[in-house]
Amino acid sequence: MILRLLFLIFPLNLTKTDEENWENIPEHQLLLGQKALVTRKMDGCSATYILTAGGEFYCCGRRFTYKNDCFNRYTKVGHEIVRPALEKWVKKYNETIIVRGEITGHGVNGNKVNKDSKGPLKFNLFKTIHPSKDNTIWKWGLYGTQGHFLWCTEVLGLELETVPILGEMTITKDFLLQFQQAPKEDGEGVVIEFEDGTHYKAKSMDYYSNI
């Protein structure tokens, strides 16, 4: 398999996707006692896709952007699943859209406990970003706003599957410890997203010790 790299950095000055472990964050920054969106953390490959209002399409992995004529899981998912949905969005709203999510299935990160590696390749959306046409104003799709990925899929018609939604919950230390101490059968863990953009993960130690 030949991987033809187009950029060593993301287009539009994007940074790579990442969530810090809650244990590494000072307690006063965890926003304990506040409500947040909780989603299941899927064990796959992070991917970013961009379709500009002018029709330029970009397929990005965690660190690289790939040319559209190469063949790998990022471009396969991009062209077969993501691009058709983004083309409908751009046609309807005439705006550039950036989506981020997790590629799962088809042996991605295959190990003895990863249920997400089974089945066909899928794209599981967890972030939408909406830059202006001149790329000077960015709407980051914060939770609770009309740019958020749930609003885009449930209300505005973005035809992409999302990561599993566990719901809006009040975050406490016991809540975080519950997921940290969860058995491996429950999966990798959860991602917690607050309305101000704060986000972090709580991962199952049992899951990681059995990979």
Write out the residue ranges for each language-model feature:
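Core nucleotide-handling region used for phosphoryl-transfer chemistry
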Residues: 1-211
